[in-house]
């Protein structure tokens, strides 16, 4: 019926069938519908058979250690997870699957905790309701390394989507012990690890009687564990937004279930006003990203960006570790190349090194693993501008459960000093300088969109920009070959990071302009990062470059 409805729509047919969804290091993500370029049970089975071949190639013990499977609140997520389990079990791979939706970081934890060979999460994170995804992990709890992702992609090309799939009935697999459920016991193990991350929980006890927090899970997986961890931290007044505590993959109360947008917090803000609350915390549907809303000096509720929250946490974690004498000998803060340079200023001014990685938490996880292996540094905090934060060694993906807890601890610390988090953010600008950032997403859907993205990135290499808006370019970094070129003399030098389709422009006056195609959606992203003598100057620089971005990316 679904395909019959589009039989006369050539553009829709082409969009759904012109090529399969590409399996990348982030797995698969797409709109739910029939077609090889959409998310549906056939694509799930196909990807899972290809994944199973990679696990089987590791040997019998890898199959016995098996795979941990998780899913979020989205329409079809549980069904897709059970389908994946059925294919894995039929391939002789032991499956541990959660008995209901869980936060993404708990899957990363479960892989490490149970020593499984791999992990799989059915989620589209903060994307609109039409989307679902297939996110893959390896034995270290981090997202799949490139060589394994490439092997899965090759297997998908080789295997027929219908005839080469091994699967069995899910209930039969459970009865035979090939599939076992994870539940409360795993939750407790996860929460006990999260509870090791607070730096100075005493500050919470000092304010717990009067400090109120409003929480919303955006209809998703944080609904149980985030309020629970805040209570265990010592908070007594956690007010959960009742409508958004209802699990619903249609996200009926928001246009977009993304804590980046203030619109999603409308109900939570109303609740906060009724209860005179200073802090609102929101987590996305798979509970790996965290957004906050604060009262400003005039009593208005305002959102903070992922960059701002990351800087606040960087500064707080360093301050608290120094106060409690828990700072390691060689501490490091990690961030992605598109994340604010204010974090570097906050780290380095306090004697902590700051390292950059490519965009995506898998790259931050690789750096954490490198530090563990070579002993050169111990990371104390890792974050991205896209609202993802992590500390500790229990997981290898961004964690909204721990982030919510640390934000709440930080808020308590400032309350003991008679300050709000808004006051603290104002102090950050005084301490580290006035930074301003903006991310612009330009959607390029369908076949023509993919082609345009390729053409755009090639044009930027073939005809190098010399200025953007009114700003002259000092250096151009091309992260594909890993070269940094001085525009004055044309000389290039190699960079440590390479192999990603990113163009990075260092402009006069310390401003940055970055262009990259999204790894998960049909869009090009432009990141603008500016520093000024004051906030107005920094914002003006961003405005000029934002206007220029729309001319460059069209």
Give short role names for the model-derived ranges:
Residues 1-84, 173-174, 179-210, 221:
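An N-terminal, well-structured beta->alpha segment
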Residues 68-131, 236-291:
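N-terminal small/polar loop signature for handling phosphorylated ligands or for N-terminal nucleophile
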Residues 12-21, 132-266, 272:
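Gly/Ser/Thr-enriched, mixed-charge loops and adjacent short helices
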Residues 17-37, 124-127, 213, 217-225, ...:
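Conserved phosphate/anionic-ligand binding catalytic regions in large, soluble enzymes, centered on
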Residues 80-88, 131-138, 288-307, 343:
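Short Gly/Thr/Asp-enriched flexible loops that form oxyanion-binding sites at enzyme active sites
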Residues 273, 277-279, 300-302, 320-516, ...:
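Phosphate-binding and adjacent anionic-ligand microenvironments
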Residues 137-167, 307-330, 335-345, 400, ...:
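Glycine-rich phosphate-binding loop plus the immediately following alpha-helix
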